[in-house]
């Protein structure tokens, strides 16, 4: 019996083998053949294999696996797993407590299919793996899509040509070393005049809800004044922090430009802002390297966190380099002891302790979000940390001189930090679910039910001021507040899908419940995608906040789209008896059709959108419609132009230090870079009207 249970999981796999160790089917031929002659022979061989026979063989194998899984599940009934086979699913907050199902419960494991092992894609540089809960793995598990996606991707790669090796470095420059090391004088010379920096700092604090979780506004303003009094004595790391703030603020400013207006003045302003972004972006790693960031110290984590945020907003798709940079940040945080609560250590002031808790909570959240986007296990485990959650304070409630912290405000008090606190609590529960889904061992369905209850409880605990009801009931809220509510909803429904996905087609009574939860959650996510697409149009409520629909947010919509495609494939083919009603399937088709049109708009600037468009074209029967490559040159994302085209976003080697529209001026004996007049005019604002919201 034990041997039968162990067979559920892969013991070995590699080139030429399936996750079960068997020889691959013809449709799984490795596309990366080193010998050119062999490559031609392999291509001809694949072309000679009838695709209908491949699909038939795959269907037979899948049916055998389903039957085998059903037999294993029936034999497991009434048997308590051995300690070595039990999943490590802790009950909050005790990390070491494992739930052993009683003998009168049904410890049914999830059905095993090839997609349950994740997806491995061969590339020119190696192999890319994503877990089974990732949207790409879900699509790769649909047999009918394999030849379409592979052929289309190959065609797109051929049309793009071969990139010259080592001419450009994309992604976070910090991972590759600085191509242009700079000293402090050179770095200081690229800081704009104070009038411009003031406006950028204000834009950052008034636009970015992550700011109170990373920086204390009162303390930062003190350091900011000290910098202008004597720039030469400022540490390189703090300068890097300032550049991350300016880089983010300039991105926010650029996103406010109307993509529908292509006048010379607007185009000129867009170029100036992009040049500013490129300059600031290049200076950040230069400052970090100059300040020996790997040793840790003040402002290192804050700078790295905002640097990662800037890279996320500059990326149209998930980028492995950002996840790796997040790993470096986690390692530095562990090295600096942020994973242990400050109460264990004497000498830390109340102010320092509270800020360390804020920063650690944000790092945990970023780690989970980026790991989920990459389809990989998260780096921080719950049993590694005992740092308490931060309190609900206004920045005016405490400062560096505080001797004893005041009582935390109630959750009904909508402070700038409250959204981060509420999201951190929700992400704690979602983190358990992500660990749960990433566990390679089988686990009983009773554990899924327990985790589902935990997730529902976490959602119910969201304060009323941050709960989503409908767009009609949010018309008096600020756009930022609306987006916060939407994000809390999308991460909740994504977690529902991740938790129940493996049980969608399990041949047991519980599968119907899990299948319905997954499908309804996916439809909910696509409803939010459609709503955001409409509300981010010109003159709509979220138009100025459309930059918030980042690749992290789109990941949830990609998962929802893929899971609905996966369901339709089963409903039409392998397991039609497990399909829902015809009217429900029609609702899914309608939702996918709208989603297809949305993804099509961004398919020129996003390879992820391009892949899902091709998948939807097959599922919806639009194979003969214009492909993603012919979607037009608009590069639209939710009805707006892609803010940072791939051709200029990731090219550090071309980042301009001096631009035709920039001006130079002497200030305090130093040359300072001053943006063009259009940018200065754009950044002009009423300081008192946009006074910082942090209790000043």
Curated annotation (Swiss-Prot):
Could you give one GO CC term from the UniProt record?
A: nucleus
Its recorded name reads Equisetin cluster transcription factor eqxF
In terms of CDD domains, this protein maps to:
fungal_TF_MHR (cd12148)
Gene Ontology biological process terms, A to Z: DNA-templated transcription
- Provide this UniProt record's keywords sorted from A to Z: Nucleus
Stored InterPro entries: Sec_Metabolite_Reg, Transcription_factor_dom_fun
Organism whose genome encodes this protein: Fusarium heterosporum
Region listing for Disordered, in residue ranges = 1-24, 73-117
One Pfam family name is: Fungal_trans
Where in or outside the cell is it found?
Nucleus
Q: What does this protein do?
A: Transcription factor that regulates the expression of the gene cluster that mediates the biosynthesis of Equisetin.
Source species taxonomy: Eukaryota, Fungi, Dikarya, Ascomycota, Pezizomycotina
* Alphabetized GO MF terms: DNA binding; zinc ion binding
Q: Does the keyword Disulfide bond apply?
A: no
Instruction: Report disulfide bridges, numbered on this chain.
Output: none
